[in-house]
């Protein structure tokens, strides 16, 4: 059985917490997660989500207080001898359906498309990985007719940095992530809206501790 505790804090003095417990039952994984809202005033079902997942095949999430299901089905087919990873995602509560596909041309090059059925919006992304160290990802948003750009890379072993820029909103972002079995995982996110006159940066810190039970 595996468990995880996650905490998040930002400069606006907003804080949140979450806990997840997962264990294997044959070839499927069962998972339960709660948030700090579950115990904010008194113990309740607020924030409780139950899930069952078969990696690479399907996952079903059930939000207990909202009585809302989220389904995801995955499959891989081959196109011109290249793997095409497909996903169908449907959220019952807001009646939202997403179709997602990623064509893995080789270990360094991937092309993906994400289509929202209800809105008709489509995003196209190309991902290039250079020598397993640096990844460059331009994304085109068809509805907004705009581009997003992201560059990420590994530094100092367990650490990685990611810089991003959204041309439609003019938001510049920077992430520092560490994934370590010894010290746990944490992420520092900073962003600034270049379209704002004052350009006040936003900063948040997220930490995750993983346990084997």
Swiss-Prot record:
It is found in: Plastid, Etioplast membrane; Plastid, Chloroplast outer membrane. The keyword Transferase does not apply. One of its GO terms (cellular component) is chloroplast outer membrane. High-conductance voltage-dependent solute channel with a slight selectivity for cations transporting triosephosphates, dicarboxylic acids, ATP, inorganic phosphate (Pi), sugars, and positively or negatively charged amino acids. Residues 12-17, 42-54, 80-92, 118-121, 156-158, 179-201 are chloroplast intermembrane. This is Outer envelope pore protein 24, chloroplastic. It comes from the Eukaryota. Coiled coil: none annotated. PANTHER family: OUTER ENVELOPE PORE PROTEIN 24A, CHLOROPLASTIC-RELATED (PTHR35284:SF1). Keywords: Chloroplast, Ion transport, Membrane, Plastid, Plastid outer membrane, Porin, Transmembrane, Transmembrane beta strand, Transport. The chain crosses the membrane at residues 2-11, 18-27, 32-41, 55-63, 70-79, 93-102, 108-117, 122-131, 144-155, 159-167, 170-178, 202-211. Homooligomers form large rather nonselective pores in plastidial outer membranes. Belongs to the plastid outer envelope porin OEP24 (TC 1.B.28) family. It comes from Pisum sativum. Present in roots, shoots and leaves. InterPro entries: OEP24. GO terms for molecular function: porin activity; voltage-gated monoatomic cation channel activity. Residues 1, 28-31, 64-69, 103-107, 132-143, 168-169, 212-213 are cytoplasmic. Its main location: plastid. The keyword Transcription regulation does not apply. GO terms for biological process: regulation of monoatomic ion transmembrane transport. It is a multi-pass membrane protein. Disulfide bonds: none annotated.
């Amino acid at each position: 059985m595996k468990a995880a505790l996650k905490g998040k804090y930002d400069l606006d003095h907003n804080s949140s917490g979450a806990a997840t417990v997962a264990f294997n039952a044959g070839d499927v994984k069962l998972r339960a997660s709660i948030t700090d809202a579950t115990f904010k005033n008194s113990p309740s079902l607020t924030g409780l989500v139950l899930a069952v997942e078969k990696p690479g095949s399907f996952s079903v999430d059930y939000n207990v207080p909202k009585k809302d299901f989220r389904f995801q089905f995955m499959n891989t087919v081959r196109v011109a001898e290249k793997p095409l990873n497909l996903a169908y995602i449907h959220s019952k509560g807001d009646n939202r359906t997403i179709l997602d596909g990623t064509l893995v041309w080789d270990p360094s090059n991937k092309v993906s498309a994400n289509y929202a059925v209800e809105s008709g919006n489509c995003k196209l992304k190309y991902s290039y990985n250079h020598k397993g160290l640096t990844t460059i990802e331009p994304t085109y948003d068809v509805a907004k007719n705009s581009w997003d750009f992201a560059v990420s890379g590994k530094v100092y072993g367990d650490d990685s940095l990611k810089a991003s820029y959204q041309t439609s909103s003019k938001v510049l972002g920077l992430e520092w992530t560490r994934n370590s079995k010894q010290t746990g995982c944490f992420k520092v996110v900073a962003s600034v809206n270049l379209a704002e006159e004052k350009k006040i940066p936003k900063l948040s810190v997220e930490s995750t501790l993983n346990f084997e039970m």
